[in-house]
């Protein structure tokens, strides 16, 4: 039986591709890519798939095809999708593959409430191996990745309605919070430290292959840094896997869609508001190692699944 991983035809977030790379690294041969939103439509020979990541944009497409044999590990259900995923049919599907390995405690508790056996695994990106991404030509001191991007107004292309009006009202306030957060960062970084800014969001249209290349490049940037400051979990967690010190800034993550994703994952890194930066000495931040038991457990379960 062939192996597969989750892929993303329309995502502009490198974090999605970084999660897929973490899954792909377990296979000797190139796995099949199946789009997360089209799992229900798969109608070829049976495949084994590592079912990890954020689910999903189109929950009406749940559950997946019967020709897909999943290992649920590092699995997250978005709060806005939970009602459509956890229908009677969806619950019965998940029960066939329990226990479900959950990326966060929010998903674990959600599944436990409907009598699905579930446990916390953390994120599959914790299994990434630094050796693969060492690059002597990259020497970052402080790497700042996508801090406070959710506080910046995004391009709006939907018709005017009440929600749009509310968003337009919020834009000046969100931009003020963004500028305030950035000032807090710069104020607390010594002028003799070299700082590099990169984004986890892809700004222009790229092919799927190019997106994976960009994700690999971002992992190299993280692996060859002395410190990572970010508001993105899939920049923070690879840094933890690589033994790179991390400061996770949680400004703008108050909505349930955001804080549900970090429930439990914040055990692995220092999570603070930018206003608290003056209370810590970033030179003394030591990377935690409490992820190792979770990383080893996920690796063992995946290897057993592949070799079955």
Model feature map: region roles:
Residues 1-308:
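Active-site anion-handling motifs in enzyme catalytic cores
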């Amino acid at each position: 039986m062939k192996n597969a991983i989750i892929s993303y035809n329309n995502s502009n977030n490198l974090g999605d591709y970084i999660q897929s790379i973490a899954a792909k690294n377990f296979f000797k041969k190139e796995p099949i890519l199946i789009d997360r939103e089209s799992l229900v439509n798969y109608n070829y020979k049976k495949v084994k798939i590592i079912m990890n990541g954020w689910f999903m944009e189109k929950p009406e497409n749940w559950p997946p095809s019967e020709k897909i044999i999943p290992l649920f590990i590092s699995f997250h259900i978005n709060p806005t999708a939970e009602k459509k995923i956890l229908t009677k049919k969806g619950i019965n599907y998940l029960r066939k593959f329990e226990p479900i390995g959950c990326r966060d405690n929010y998903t674990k508790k959600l599944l436990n409430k409907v009598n699905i056996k579930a446990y916390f695994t953390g994120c599959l990106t914790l299994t990434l191996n630094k050796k693969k991404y060492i690059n002597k030509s990259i020497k970052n001191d402080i790497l700042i990745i996508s801090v406070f991007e959710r506080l910046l107004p995004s391009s709006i292309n939907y018709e005017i309605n009440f929600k749009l009006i509310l968003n337009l009202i919020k834009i000046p306030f969100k931009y003020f919070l963004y500028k305030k957060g950035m000032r807090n960062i710069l104020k607390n970084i010594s002028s003799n430290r070299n700082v590099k800014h990169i984004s986890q969001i892809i700004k222009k249209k790229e092919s799927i292959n190019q997106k994976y290349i960009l994700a690999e490049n971002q992992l190299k940037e993280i692996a060859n840094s002395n410190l990572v400051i970010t508001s993105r979990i899939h920049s923070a967690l690879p840094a933890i896997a690589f033994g790179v010190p991390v400061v996770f800034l949680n400004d703008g993550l108050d909505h349930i869609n955001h804080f549900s994703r970090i429930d439990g994952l914040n055990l692995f890194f220092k999570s603070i508001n930018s206003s608290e930066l003056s209370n810590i000495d970033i030179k003394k931040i030591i990377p935690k190692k409490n992820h190792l038991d979770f990383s080893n457990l996920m690796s063992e379960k995946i290897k057993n699944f592949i070799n079955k």
